[in-house]
């Protein structure tokens, strides 16, 4: 899990999801999982 100001897709499997006003990137690769904050 990375906390970043700008979340971007890193690979093709990354998905951008908005959950309770928090923008997240979910991916099979744990290194690619991000949260905006």
From Swiss-Prot:
Q: Which HAMAP family match?
A: Ribosomal_bL36
From what organism does this protein derive?
Answer: Geobacter metallireducens (strain ATCC 53774 / DSM 7210 / GS-15)
Q: Which GO terms describe its cellular component?
A: cytoplasm; ribonucleoprotein complex; ribosome
BP terms from Gene Ontology: translation
InterPro entries, per this entry?
Answer: Ribosomal_bL36, Ribosomal_bL36_sp
Family the UniProt entry places it in: Belongs to the bacterial ribosomal protein bL36 family.
Protein name (Swiss-Prot/TrEMBL): Large ribosomal subunit protein bL36
The alphabetized UniProt keywords are: Ribonucleoprotein, Ribosomal protein
According to the UniProt entry, its GO molecular function terms are:
structural constituent of ribosome
């Amino acid at each position: 899990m990375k906390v970043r100001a700008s979340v971007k897709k890193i690979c093709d499997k990354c998905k951008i999801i908005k959950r309770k006003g928090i923008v997240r990137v979910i991916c099979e690769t744990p290194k690619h999982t991000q949260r905006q904050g």
